[in-house]
């Protein structure tokens, strides 16, 4: 009985809480990659402006008490950039990584940068990702918009780091795909 009570209070806090955040791999059901567009995008860093950069969520006990934090095994900023780079390449763009929010190259179609506003996963492992995507053409900012999405790998009775990572991955994919679709529409309509 004491063991059961301890498990309920702890909320299974002994389970690993260090998920590795990955961007979803393309599957056979996804649309085929777009034909090369012969357009270059400079992908600059996304600044991490989350309120608490040390974790991506907390685990609570059955009584709603905070028991432990979910700390990603990898860098959230790199994870976001990898997701955006993947989607840009899947849409046929040539991607060059920049080093500052204003990096541009002569002949580049656009420079992309942004801000990471939120990356959180709750105890039921519903994930939320919010980024502000920015696009510059030449010296002019032509887009600055919030792209936010939720994702869920399903409710987890026994929360795991993998379930949290999968939910966040789903949320990031939804946010990034909307951002890249809007960027793509802007660049293809300006031909």
Regions found by a protein language model. Name each.
Residues 1-12:
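Sec-dependent bacterial lipoprotein signal peptides
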Residues 12-35, 90-94, 142-191:
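C-terminal/domain-edge helix-coil "capping" segments
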Residues 12-82, 184-191:
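A structural "domain/chain start" motif
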Residues 13-23, 91-144, 152-158:
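Surface-exposed short loop/turn segments
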Residues 59-61, 131, 148-150:
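Short intrinsically disordered coil segments
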Residues 66-74, 121, 159-166:
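Second-shell loop/turn segments in exported
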Residues 83-91:
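Amphipathic alpha-helical segments
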